[in-house]
Amino acid sequence: MLRRQNNFGQKLLVEVKMYGKEPSNMANIVADKFKELGIEKDCMVVSFDLKLMEEVKKILPELKTGYIMPLLLGDLPDTNVDFYALEDFSYNEKIAIQAKIKKKKLLIWTVNDIIKIRKYLRQPVDGIITDELEELKEEKKYLKENNTYFDKYIRIITNI
C-alpha cells in the first residue's frame, strides 16, 4: 500500500498509533520503515505522541512529521515537528496565524462533509484530511475554474 501511494495523486499521511506497549526504540522502527520503503520524501507521518514524532524528526529530518491535536484550548504548543493536525472543532483563524508565525503547516481533520470541505478550502489552512478525496478534488477544481471576483462575491452572499 505505501509503495502504491502515488497512484492516488495525493501525498499519503501515515498515522502511527501508540498503545503503550511499544518498544523503546519505536522512533527508530518508524524511521527505518520509511527509509526501507524509500518513501521518506513522499509521505508524511503523524501521531498523537509528540515525543515520538520529535524523535522520528531527529532521526530522519527529511520525513515530514506532525502532531495530532484532538482538542486545542489556547495556543499552539511549541514543537519540533513540521505540522499540526488539528481537529475541525478546534480550528479558528487565530490558530492559523499562530501556525504561520511558528512556520508550521496546519492540517484540519477529519473533514468529510462537503459544506466543511468548502469552508476549509477558503480558510488559511495548508491541508484537509478527509475520507472524501474525490469530493475534495472536485471542489478544488470548481474553485479554481470559478475564481473571479463575481464568483467570490456570490459565494460570500450565498454562503457556499
Question: Can you name each region flagged by the protein language model?
Answer:
Residues R3-I160:
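Short loop-to-alpha-helix "cap/lid" segments that border enzyme active sites
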